[in-house]
């Protein structure tokens, strides 16, 4: 790109927040994504693409598979980031995999358009390997470990509730602990969403834009 891309906040025709990086192809993709996903997802994709093109410093049509491997290596060895889980430097495998997904989605969009010089995605699907029986399979570029969710013990929940000083804070934590609400869902609750007679909560803005009652 010859210069560090700058992420600019824009607005769509419908007044919704959008993003632009100053490259026509990237901006076209971000506008496409803006109409198909939630604001948090759009923000993550925009930042992922900004990070990628800042590090690679190439125009989208010039990127090759070697650049993808170089980007993965850079993210794994980023000394400006220290993981809390193990104290090692570099981003987590989950974060790197998400960024690769954003990059892959961008190039899949360019290929699907058919009116750009990009005929195929430079993002490898994975590394080919052979298992027993001669069956080939694909090993992902970044392995994301499967981990069990971390939950609070009853004693920890009791200690947490005991440390809260207001009824509002206790109600928010109870909604998450007993109702399984996500943080963003609790923050999005309005007084009218609390149905006291039915002892239920109406979630208007759940994950993926889905609504539900708990």
Regions found by a protein language model. Name each.
Residues 18-22, 92, 96-100, 179:
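Short, low-complexity cationic-aromatic patches
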Residues 27-43, 49-142:
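N-terminal core-binding DNA-recognition domain of tyrosine recombinases/integrases
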Residues 130-159, 208-214:
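DNA breakage-rejoining catalytic core of tyrosine-based enzymes
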Residues 184, 188-214:
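Conserved tyrosine-mediated DNA breakage-rejoining catalytic core shared by Y-recombinases
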């Amino acid at each position: 790109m010859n210069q560090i891309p700058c992420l600019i906040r824009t607005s769509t025709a419908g007044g919704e927040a959008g993003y632009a990086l100053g490259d026509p192809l990237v901006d076209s993709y971000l506008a496409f994504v803006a109409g198909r996903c939630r604001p948090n997802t759009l923000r993550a994709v925009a930042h992922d693409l900004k990070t990628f093109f800042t590090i690679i410093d190439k125009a989208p049509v010039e990127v090759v598979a070697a650049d993808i491997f170089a980007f993965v290596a850079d993210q794994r060895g980023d000394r400006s980031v220290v993981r809390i889980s193990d104290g090692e430097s570099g981003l987590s495998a989950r974060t790197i995999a998400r960024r690769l997904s954003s990059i892959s989605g961008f190039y899949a969009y360019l290929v699907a358009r058919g009116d750009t010089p990009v005929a195929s995605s430079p993002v490898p699907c994975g590394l080919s390997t052979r298992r027993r029986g001669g069956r080939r399979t694909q090993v992902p570029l970044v392995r994301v470990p499967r981990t069990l969710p971390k939950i609070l013990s009853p004693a920890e929940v009791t200690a947490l509730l005991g440390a809260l000083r207001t009824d509002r804070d206790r109600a928010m934590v109870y909604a998450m602990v007993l109702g399984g609400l996500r943080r963003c869902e609790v923050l999005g609750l309005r007084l009218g969403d609390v149905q006291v007679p039915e002892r239920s909560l109406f979630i208007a803005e759940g994950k993926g834009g889905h609504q539900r009652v708990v």
